[in-house]
From Swiss-Prot:
Keyword field: Cytoplasm, Hydrolase, RNA-binding, tRNA-binding
Sites marked Stabilizes the basic form of H active site to accept a proton: D93
Protein's UniProt keywords contain Nuclease: no
This enzyme's EC code(s): 3.1.1.29
Record protein name field: Peptidyl-tRNA hydrolase
Compartments (UniProt record): Cytoplasm
SUPFAM superfamilies, per the entry: Peptidyl-tRNA hydrolase-like
Family: Belongs to the PTH family.
Species per Swiss-Prot/TrEMBL record: Aquifex aeolicus (strain VF5)
Superkingdom of the source species: Bacteria
Length: 192
C-alpha cells in the first residue's frame, strides 16, 4: 500500500524544539526541506506540509497536541485525508534503541512510548508503519522524563544530524517504492 502521510511526533513550542523527544519533528523539518514542501497549513490539529515525490502526493505532519495526545491529531489526519493507518508512517524517538540507530517496522506495540500508545488508542490498531529513531537511555539513573525533554549534547547532535539525514532517505524510499522495500536500507546500521 502506498504511503501518503508521514507523521513526526513531538511537542509544540520553542522550549521543546531541540529535545530528544522531538526527533520526529526534526525528521519532518528535514523532509520538508528536502522535498521543498508547501506549508505549514493548520489542519487536523497539526501543522501540515504538502509535497510530491516520485509523482505521488504526500502529506507531512507535526501534531500540535503534545506528545501524549498525538492520537487525536493522527485520527483527525486519517479522517481528513480519507487514509487507512497502513498508508501512514509515524516517526518518533525510542529510548530502547541506541543513539545512531533506527528501525522501520510495519506494525507493532507502542513499546511504552506514550505518543504511540495514544495513536493506537485513537485509531484502534497497531497495524501502521513506524520509524523509530534511537535516542538511547540516560547514562545515570536520571529521570527518563527529564532526559527525553532535554536537548542533545553537542556530541550527540553530530550523530543525530546524520541519523536524521538517513531517516529522510529511508522515508523517501518508503514513499517512492514501499515500506517493505525500504526496510533493508533503513535498518542497516552502517549507512550513517
Amino acid at each position: 500500500m502506498d504511503i501518503k502521510l508521514v507523521v513526526g511526533l513531538g511537542n509544540p513550542g520553542k522550549e521543546y524544539e531541540k529535545t530528544r523527544h522531538n526527533v520526529g519533528f526534526m525528521v519532518i523539518d528535514e523532509l520538508v526541506k528536502a522535498l521543498r514542501a508547501k506549508g505549514p497549513f493548520e489542519e487536523a490539529l497539526s501543522h501540515v506540509y504538502k509535497a510530491r515525490i516520485g509523482g505521488k502526493e504526500v502529506i507531512l505532519a507535526k501534531p500540535m497536541t503534545y506528545m501524549n495526545n498525538s492520537g487525536a491529531a493522527v485520527y483527525n489526519l486519517l479522517e481528513e485525508y480519507k487514509l487507512s493507518p497502513e498508508q501512514m508512517i509515524v516517526v518518533y524517538d525510542d529510548l530502547d534503541l541506541p543513539l545512531g540507530h533506527m528501525r522501520l517496522r510495519l506494525k507493532g506495540s507502542s513499546g511504552g512510548h506514550r505518543g504511540v500508545e495514544s495513536i493506537i488508542k485513537y485509531i484502534g490498531t497497531q497495524n501502521f508503519p513506524r520509524l523509530r529513531i534511537g535516542i538511547g537511555r540516560p547514562k545515570k539513573k536520571e529521570d527518563v522524563v527529564k532526559y527525553v525533554l532535554s536537548p542533545f549534547s553537542p556530541e550527540e547532535e553530530k550523530v543525530i544530524s546524520q541519523v536524521i539525514k538517513k531517516a529522510v532517505r529511508c522515508l523517501m524510499r518508503a514513499i517512492e517504492i514501499s515500506p517493505e522495500h525500504a526496510m533493508e536500507y533503513c535498518n542497516r546500521q552502517d549507512l550513517i
